[in-house]
Amino acid sequence: MKTQEIEKKVRQQDAQVLAQGYSPAIRAMEIAAIVSFVSLEVALVYRLWGTPYAGTWLLLSAVLLGYLAADFVSGFVHWMGDTWGSTEMPVLGKALIRPFREHHVDEKAITRHDFVETNGNNCLISLPVAIIALCLPMSGPGWVFCASFLGAMIFWVMATNQFHKWSHMDSPPALVGFLQRVHLILPPDHHRIHHTKPYNKYYCITVGWMNKPLTMVHFFPTAERLITWATGLLPRQDDIGAEAARALVVAAGGSEAPVVQAAKELLTQATVQEKPASTRP
């Protein structure tokens, strides 16, 4: 099925209804998440500052690898939010999935969000990792690197939606525009690829460096086919409507990658149990 035919089948939710889903309770939760996140990151920096193992190269490598990891994490979370779940789910639907649905029907809405609404969700999902990083022992270079890497990764994860917001602004600040042009943060033209119906590619939105490698290995399409095969769930049904979602699955069905076939065989073998031998004489 041609892409144009699939685009005609797309049916999205109402932008105003989605925007109204941002409740005072969700905002209070996001404020608490931001305060908690900043407190944990400051505590982690304090611990790292006092260790003799935190060398310059160790910290720089942790920051760079953390940036790449954050880009991948942003893509994975973005893919999960775009592809699975529903706005009607308890708690998660309004707090986490709703913003993904709103963004596809009103992509400029994010430019009207303040700091809390823009960054609160990412602070919230980063809290468990921040606690783990803070609890790691600082008894050697390896542990210090792990703590630094995790701390850097979640810092960039926290900044992801801010970079994402800037990529949708018509006139971002001058320094931001420069960083976008040299592709040190997410550039608007690069992100535009994702905002082409049916919104099924280029999910990484911290900087976008991981988009091409993940596209080359068919990472997200492979994951979708395996999940659909194993569970029967239809990817993007809540985002673009059941008809368009089914059309996408049918269009992709004829080009199944060998790795998907192999994974299906392994899963089948793992789930099929042999019948116990009869003990009757």
From Swiss-Prot:
Name of the protein in its database record: Plasmanylethanolamine desaturase
Domain notes for this protein: Histidine box-1 and -2 together with other histidine residues are essential for catalytic activity.
Membrane topology: Multi-pass membrane protein
Topological domain ranges for the Cytoplasmic compartment: 1-28, 76-123, 160-281
Top EC group: oxidoreductase
GO cellular component: plasma membrane
Catalysed reactions, as listed in the record: a 1-(1,2-saturated alkyl)-2-acyl-sn-glycero-3-phosphoethanolamine + 2 Fe(II)-[cytochrome b5] + O2 + 2 H(+) = a 1-O-(1Z-alkenyl)-2-acyl-sn-glycero-3-phosphoethanolamine + 2 Fe(III)-[cytochrome b5] + 2 H2O; 1-O-(13-methyltetradecyl)-2-(13-methyltetradecanoyl)-sn-glycero-3-phosphoethanolamine + 2 Fe(II)-[cytochrome b5] + O2 + 2 H(+) = 1-O-(1Z-13-methyltetradecenyl)-2-(13-methyltetradecanoyl)-sn-glycero-3-phosphoethanolamine + 2 Fe(III)-[cytochrome b5] + 2 H2O
One BP annotation, GO: ether lipid biosynthetic process
Span(s) of short sequence motif Histidine box-1: 164-168
Motif (Histidine box-2): 191-195
Entry EC number(s): 1.14.19.77
GO MF annotation terms: plasmanylethanolamine desaturase activity
